[in-house]
């Protein structure tokens, strides 16, 4: 194996600064002889920029960048004080404690959190805009009157990558108008046991079907590589989730153990990730 220094970061839409939250510092160990893509070293100029930002941050700010609170557990004043790197709306969570809030209320909260996150910091600490992430797996389903699309198990039955791409495009527009930057989707789990309670989130038990459909949703949400408007207006950040093997846990236990020959497991459960990466996730 080879050891590659690894730093993960994602761009926020409202700033030229890069998000320091959601990062892992340290080595990433990857197989040097593998049919999976090898991690690429980050750009040295970006490395230097990030190192400069981190060097000017207090321990408290660094910790806050790694925390992703749920919207019903904190306020804009808390954001102003702690400067969380990102936040999310979880199940049944809505702005100001109202899960049935109109889209305008979601946008209002997004603006409040963003403005709180970019207020000047004391002592010259860098200002890093926060990000809001949501689970819009088959449409922006947390919002009343948003479009709800068939779930992944049904879209997988169509084998229609263009249809899935258009679902992503429509979903991105509806997410953006509520002020949210980031979608926790696509789910590229390859379900192997129907007892798993999230089987409906999987496009198929066949990785050859999951891979192109997951990549298509990435393109729909973010825009295609080479498109000058990629990650611009009408687009949001995508996420290939959840983790290697989540669709193949023993007896279908959610977030359970995955056992078996590693090469056989990789052939099934790792296969969709290179396609999502190639699509720009």
Tell me what each language-model feature is.
Residues 6-7, 27:
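Composition-driven detection of intrinsically disordered, low-complexity segments
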Residues 18, 22-25, 33:
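Low-complexity, intrinsically disordered or signal/transmembrane-proximal segments
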Residues 7-15:
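Low-complexity, intrinsically disordered Ser/Thr/Pro- and acidic-rich segments
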Residues 1-3, 20:
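Acidic, Ala/Val/Gly-enriched low-complexity intrinsically disordered segments
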């Amino acid at each position: 194996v080879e050891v590659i220094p690894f730093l993960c970061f994602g761009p926020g839409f409202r700033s030229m600064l890069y998000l320091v939250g959601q990062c892992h510092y340290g080595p990433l160990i990857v197989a040097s002889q593998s049919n999976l893509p090898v991690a690429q070293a980050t750009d040295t100029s970006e490395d230097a920029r990030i190192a400069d930002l981190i060097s000017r941050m207090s321990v408290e700010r660094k910790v806050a960048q790694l925390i992703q609170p749920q919207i019903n557990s904190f306020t804009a004043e808390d954001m102003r004080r702690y400067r969380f790197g990102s936040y999310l709306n979880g199940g049944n969570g809505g702005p100001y404690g109202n899960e049935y809030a109109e889209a305008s209320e979601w946008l209002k909260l997004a603006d409040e959190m963003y403005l709180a996150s970019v207020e000047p910091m004391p002592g010259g600490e860098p200002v890093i805009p926060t990000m809001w992430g949501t689970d819009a797996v088959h449409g922006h389903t947390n919002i009343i009157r948003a479009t709800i699309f068939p779930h992944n198990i049904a879209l997988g039955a169509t084998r229609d990558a263009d249809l899935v791409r258009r679902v992503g495009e429509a979903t991105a527009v509806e997410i953006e108008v509520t002020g949210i930057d980031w979608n926790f989707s696509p789910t590229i789990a390859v379900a192997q046991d129907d007892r798993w309670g999230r089987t409906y989130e999987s496009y198929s038990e066949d990785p050859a079907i999951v891979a192109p459909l997951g990549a298509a949703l990435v393109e729909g949400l973010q825009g295609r590589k080479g498109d000058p408007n990629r990650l611009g207006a009408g687009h949001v950040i995508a996420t290939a989730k959840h983790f290697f093997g989540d669709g193949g846990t023993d007896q279908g236990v959610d977030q359970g153990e995955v056992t078996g020959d590693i090469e056989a497991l990789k052939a099934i459960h790792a296969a969709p990730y290179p396609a999502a990466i190639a699509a720009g996730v």
